[in-house]
């Protein structure tokens, strides 16, 4: 079993795009990435040969724009949202749940880079769908 990521590690890479299937075909053909559709969503999970797993999905309502967002593992999304604002960052979304997996919030650093916080649900650590700790 691989070592679990430590807080502060990038644990997920996400492509926010208008046409997910085009992106999947592009990266799959170039690099051999395998994509697994998530039932009931315009979203697929992928794994590259190494590095963090990721996702490709259609744009979501609200503060979502085309681009790539890296997810950083934290012990508490709530605590880090406060710390980000105190450090001069901006919170772009409320804390949201990925059912059965964990919670996230989008933020922007003082230079304008968009990133996300990820808090793993401890109950999900031993499930087959857990791609953030294996």
State what each model feature region is:
Residues 1-24, 51-52, 67-70, 120-134:
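N-terminal beta-strand motif that seeds the catalytic metal site of vicinal oxygen chelate
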Residues 27:
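Catalytic core of tubulin tyrosine ligase-like
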Residues 30-35, 88-90:
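Conserved acetyl-CoA-binding loop of GNAT-fold acetyltransferases
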Residues 34-40, 93-98, 122-125:
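Conserved catalytic-core motifs of GNAT/GCN5-like acyltransferases
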Residues 19-20, 72-114:
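Vicinal oxygen chelate
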Residues 12, 42-43, 93, 104:
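Short, acidic/polar N-cap/turn motifs at the starts of alpha helices
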Residues 32-67, 110, 114-120:
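Conserved short beta-strand elements that form part of the metal-binding/catalytic scaffold
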């Amino acid at each position: 079993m691989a070592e679990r990521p430590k807080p502060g590690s990038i644990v997920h890479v996400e492509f926010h795009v208008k046409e997910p299937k085009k992106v999947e075909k592009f990266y799959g053909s170039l690099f051999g990435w395998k994509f697994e559709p998530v039932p009931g969503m315009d979203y697929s999970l992928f794994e590259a040969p190494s590095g963090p797993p990721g996702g490709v999905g259609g744009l979501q309502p609200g503060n979502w724009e085309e681009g790539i967002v890296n997810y950083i593992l934290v012990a508490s999304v709530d605590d880090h949202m406060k710390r980000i604002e105190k450090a001069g960052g901006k919170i772009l979304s409320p804390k949201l749940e990925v059912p059965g997996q964990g919670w996230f919030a989008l933020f922007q650093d003082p230079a304008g880079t968009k990133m996300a916080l990820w808090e793993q649900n401890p109950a999900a650590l031993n499930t087959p769908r857990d791609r953030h700790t294996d």
